[in-house]
Amino acid sequence: MEGGRAPACTTQVSFVCQRCSQPLKLDTSFKILDRLTIQELTAPPLTAAPARPGDAQEESALSEEAFTEGRQDGVSRRFIPPARMMSTESANSFTLIGEASDGGTMENLSRRLKVTGDLFDIMSGQTDVDHPLCEECTDTLLDQLDTQLNITENECQNYKRCLEILEKMNEDDKEKLQTELKELALEEEQLIQELEDVEKNRKIVAEDFERVRAEAERLEQEEAQYQKEYCEFKRQQLELDDELKSVENQMRYAQMQLDKLKKTNVFNATFHIWHSGQFGTINNFRLGRLPSVPVEWNEINAAWGQTVLLLHALANKMGLKFQRYRLVPYGNHSYLESLTDKSKELPLYCSGGLRFFWDNKFDHAMVAFLDCVQQFKEEVEKGETRFCLPYRMDVEKGKIEDTGGSGGSYSIKTQFNSEEQWTKALKFMLTNLKWGLAWVSSQFYNK
């Protein structure tokens, strides 16, 4: 009855290619396989050696056994390997449709699938290729087999030619070949021995190479270290060379300065005596005063300080010690000290004003200084009789005479004297000191 039927079930089953794993649609000839066709497909490949009678029976029995249906309670049970079949919803798969009560139709389809799967298993077991294959993979496989077949045929032809050559040989040729074979065997042994020796030598050479390589690495490291040290020493050398050149230049410059200083007259460089108009000057300080040119007393005092310092230096250079007075150079406040009266100081500086006209210490100091210049002249004349100053000095009167010129005498004092005559007397005194300076320089610095 229709009411007693179970609902229909649908199962889609398809085979897949064992190379590209694409689903396959089997040919319709797989549905009409008879026993004879199955035996032909499952028969083992033909061999050159005759087969034993029992082998054919065993193979037939195996074939029969492989396709024997396992029936139990009227139901055929067979597991379809997932590697060859898969359930899909594809349109290329075939569909098993049946009812639970219609056991005959399902049994036939299951049997057919079992036979097909077993057939593919047998084909895969007899060859090196897994089945089933799609058309494209089959064409590719056939091309590979054709290539292998061509290679095998060529090898077979070569073997046939070698066999024909061997069959044509006589006994002498065989003996000759045997002898040659023995010689080749001996040569092979020798070559093997040589190869062993070469291998031993190779090992020795490899060990030597490793040792030499290690030594080379060590030498490279030492070379790098030496190069580093060399660069450091080179840098130090360059620095020392620069320093040496600098020192040499400094020495050269110092030597030039020394030579220049040796040629330089200290007195001439230190005390520059010249004139500026009616004034005598020492180191650019004017010594004297005119009504038209009222020189500041600070400048006059500074000029007297330089004059005292000059005469003091000349006396020390000659080893002269003055009598009656001692020169005390003290800048613009220089003075003379009386040796007979230690408490008596004769200042060679003045501030001007009314006190200047009534205080005669300044005049006494200038006369005392003129006395010291006269002592210097007399000391020089002791060793140099030809020495003579341009202007004669009269210490008692405190005057300087212009013997080579006008023949007049000029007082070095300020009291009861005009500024013009006082200034001229100071100018003549500086001229005498300039001559004394020149003589000392010629005696002590130009030798």
Curated annotation (Swiss-Prot):
Record region (Disordered): 44-71
Database matches in InterPro entries: Atg6/Beclin, Atg6/Beclin_C_sf, Atg6/beclin_CC, Atg6_BARA, BH3_dom
Pfam family, one: APG6
Molecular functions (GO terms): phosphatidylinositol 3-kinase binding; protein-macromolecule adaptor activity
Membrane protein topology class: Peripheral membrane protein
GO biological process entries: autophagosome assembly; cell division; cellular response to nitrogen starvation; defense response to virus; early endosome to late endosome transport; late endosome to vacuole transport; mitophagy; positive regulation of autophagy
Cellular component GO terms held in the UniProt record: autophagosome; endoplasmic reticulum membrane; endosome membrane; Golgi apparatus; mitochondrial membrane; phagophore assembly site; phosphatidylinositol 3-kinase complex, class III, type I; phosphatidylinositol 3-kinase complex, class III, type II
Region (Evolutionary conserved domain (ECD)): 242-447
Main location, first listed in the record: cytoplasm
Subcellular location: Cytoplasm; Golgi apparatus, trans-Golgi network membrane; Endosome membrane; Endoplasmic reticulum membrane
Claim: Membrane is one of the keywords in the record: yes
Compositional bias of kind Low complexity: 44-53
Physiological role: Plays a central role in autophagy. Acts as core subunit of different PI3K complex forms that mediate formation of phosphatidylinositol 3-phosphate and are believed to play a role in multiple membrane trafficking pathways such as initiation of autophagosomes, maturation of autophagosomes and endocytosis. Involved in regulation of degradative endocytic trafficking and required for the abscission step in cytokinesis, probably in the context of PI3KC3-C2.
Family to which this protein belongs: Belongs to the beclin family.
Subunit organization: Component of the PI3K (PI3KC3/PI3K-III/class III phosphatidylinositol 3-kinase) complex.
Name under which the protein is recorded: Beclin-1
Species this chain originates from: Gallus gallus (Chicken)
